[in-house]
Amino acid sequence: MKNMEQIDFVVTWVNGKDVDWCKRKSEFEKEYNIFQDLNSEERYREWGLMKYWFRAVEKYAPWVNKIYFITEGHVPNWLDVNHPKLVHVKHEDYIEKQFLPTFNSNVIEMSLIHLKDLSEKFVLFNDDCFINDFVKQSDFFENNLPKDTGIFSPLIPRENSLAPIVLNNMEIINKYFSKKKILEQNFSKFFNIKYGKHLLKNICLLPWSDLLGFYDSHIPVSYCKSNFLEVYEKEHAIFNLTFKNKFRNKNEINHWLIRYWQLSSGNFIPRNINFGKNYAISNEPTDIINELKLSKYKIICINDGESIDNFDEVKGLMINAFEKKFPEKSSFEKK
């Protein structure tokens, strides 16, 4: 049995410049009627920042147990795959063969139920989420429970958004949980001073008896693997439906379902809302560059702005800012 104090990091990465991968993706796009708003080319764009993700982890979270680096098979040419803390996982290593290849991030993340050696406690990162300052294990887990924010927020349907998928998540949550019981059993976890002004959301939504949605901060999520398995056992049909989708589809679920389950079960410890922040890259990413200098937030997520019209220029600015913050190579890089 693994040490319950161990915390793994899981990060998924796609090399959007890999010629063979792009060719396979293009072939399957012709075969499947994909939803372009959920599968735009910008979602696969390569920013060249992955080495700084590892530098940040080594500098700010040296206590991490293992890093599960999940890819289709490709590996950055600078990465030392023999590093003792690194576990390079190919899709074929844990995703059922019948569902491969997949270009669907939800399949890649929801299939973590099959990653046998993964610790009970892990933090799921996207490759656009970076540790921005020193963090402790207790920033992610406390008393063996995930740290998170229990903030209600109504689901707002928008074009080019994840709203349909989030709606599917919430249908399942309302199937198993009563908002009344949630608040009766864990009132202080939802009405907590650590949420700041976001407390108003929970107050304003009190008149509604059903759960209308949860606030998603778009930062790495702390998970207990047992919660993934519990939800899979109860709702394996929609898991399998999701697994069949080569590309993201409006009829599926994503890993936030497990997060909502943890929140609804009261299996979490409240965390300060200002722990992390989500930024969208724009043509002038001044706010992101300043944040890298000041480290106001422990975690930052840098979302690719689909409206960027000077990509190469902005990419250069971002790489320069990260290089200034993390100039020293990490031990994860080849010598």
UniProtKB/Swiss-Prot annotation:
Its EC number is 2.7.-.-. Coiled coil: none annotated. GO terms for molecular function: transferase activity, transferring phosphorus-containing groups. One of its GO terms (biological process) is polysaccharide biosynthetic process. InterPro entries: Stealth, Stealth_CR1, Stealth_CR2. Keywords: Exopolysaccharide synthesis, Transferase. It comes from the Bacteria. Belongs to the stealth family. Stealth proteins are part of a protein family that is conserved from bacteria to higher eukaryotes. Family members were first identified in microbes as proteins that help pathogens to elude the host innate immune system. Microbial stealth proteins are involved in the biosynthesis of exopolysaccharides. Stealth proteins are predicted to function as hexose-1-phosphoryltransferases. This is Capsular polysaccharide phosphotransferase WcwK.
